[in-house]
Amino acid sequence: GRLLADRRVEVITDDQTETVVGEHGILAAGSVPFTIPGVDIDNKYIVDNEGALAFGETPKKLGVIGAGVIGLELGSVWRRLGAEVTLFEAADTFLPVVDQDMSKAAAREFKKQGLDIRLGTKVSAAKVSRSKVKVTYSDGDQEHDATFDRLLVAVGRRAASENLLCADSGVELTERGQVDVNDQCQTSVPQVWAIGDLVRGPMLAHKASEEGIAVAETIAGHHGHFNLDTVPWVIYTDPEIAWVGRTENDLKAAGIDYRSGSFPFAATGRGLAMGDAAG
């Protein structure tokens, strides 16, 4: 469906189209994977994150484009299941959104686990031939080829705002294609709200849930409260990576005075019980 003017929603099914009207409307269409030129996803040999959950067997060699959250989560799972995993990351910095002490520690652990993370590499093409995927990539001025049994494209996700709004809906989008909202998740149209992956902030399910609760409370006449700065971020790798609030780099960039401290994971109760010193 899509949003029309005056809080009307056009609902399209296989056999009919109807229009419904509401006093309030909440946009929660989620997100879709990014694609890159020269790499066509068939979800058999070249897959997105959903396709990477449907392999019939463990690939001997798995290539991953993108060493961000999705690439690391799925890449590390298939590594633990026995695949040789190579991750191509265009950025020169590993996990730049994460506190740098944490990202450095995580990079060391992933290397020990056998993940081959290649920073500063850009994939320009991927072709399927004889049940293999040939990947062409560059690192600086040098171009290389690599062959894999499967290739996962994990270069992030974007708001699913395409075809969501008609021209006269009145709802505005940002330059990134997200629905533009204020701190209360209200759009440019009164009584129309947007939450989750459609709007600014991390694309996390619990963030969308909190936004939905806050919007429902506001619609009901209560004080809906949501603070984007206190949303926990998490990357489901082993070891897990998680944080709440601003990172040290964020504080430095904002010119905010701060104190920092650290505590080794090996000295925590969980670390001692599991015999795990990483972190």
Model-identified regions with their sequence ranges:
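A Rossmann-like FAD-binding core segment of flavoenzymes
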Residues: 2-10, 81-183, 246, 253-259, ...
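Conserved redox-cofactor binding core of oxidoreductases
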Residues: 2-26
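Core beta-strand elements of the Rossmann-like FAD/NAD(P) dinucleotide-binding domain
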Residues: 15-24, 141-150, 188
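Glycine-rich dinucleotide-binding loop and its adjacent helix/turn
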Residues: 29-84, 88, 113-117, 167-184, ...
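Short glycine-/acidic-enriched loop or helix-start segments at secondary-structure transitions
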Residues: 36-38, 74, 128, 162-164, ...
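FAD-site-proximal beta/loop scaffold in flavoenzymes
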Residues: 42-58, 147-219, 225-226
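Mid-to-C-terminal Rossmann-like scaffold of FAD/NAD(P)H-dependent oxidoreductases
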Residues: 99-101, 112, 123-125, 160, ...
